[in-house]
Design a protein with these regions (language model features):
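A solvent-exposed interaction/effector surface
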Residues: 1-171
Length: 171
């Protein structure tokens, strides 16, 4: 399903990569940077209190408040939509967050914004993950923004979040 939501202003604590293409490539590249491998970053994010999307999940995914994201970035790689971006992994935090920032991570302010959500319900990770990813990507690529009176925001710093928890959804 596709729907619109307003996401309030918040902060995004994350690491980013300007060359990676997808989740596995992202973590492979990050593992080459001291202190930025998956286990270290997920552990640091797990220790952060007050994550906006933390539902108390035990796995390093959207249920525990950890999300993958694209950030519009002029110095990033050109994605399949023709937009330069960086891939990022992190957690959304309250706009007034004053806690610790691990030295290998970045904290950015994200203004309130209208977001289009492309959502797929629960699925079997082992047998359906690739097909679900392809469906979400196809829906995003073919979406007619003019039909809802919007256009794709390519402003530098704009964030696209990806919530992946196969027991609930991919959006």
């Amino acid at each position: 399903k596709t729907y619109l939501v307003t996401i309030p202003a918040h902060k995004f604590l994350h690491i980013r990569n300007y060359e990676s293409i997808g989740y596995w490539d992202f973590w492979q590249r990050q593992s080459q940077i001291p202190g930025q491998d998956c286990e270290t970053i997920c552990g640091l994010l797990e220790s952060i209190k007050g994550k906006l999307d933390d539902l108390g999940g035990k796995e390093a995914n959207s249920g525990s408040g950890q999300v993958m994201a694209f950030i519009n970035a002029p110095e990033g790689r050109i994605c399949s939509w023709g937009i330069p971006l960086a891939e990022a992994y992190g957690a959304r935090l309250p706009a007034d967050y004053q806690g610790e920032i691990p030295p290998q991570m970045r904290l950015m302010d994200v203004p309130e914004g209208e977001y289009i959500v492309f959502e797929h319900g629960p699925f079997d990770y082992e047998t359906e993950n690739q097909a679900v990813e392809e469906k979400i990507e196809a829906a995003m690529k073919s979406f007619d923004f003019s039909a809802v009176g919007y256009c794709l925001d390519t402003t530098a710093g704009r964030v696209f979040y990806f919530y992946h928890d196969c027991t609930r959804y991919w959006k």
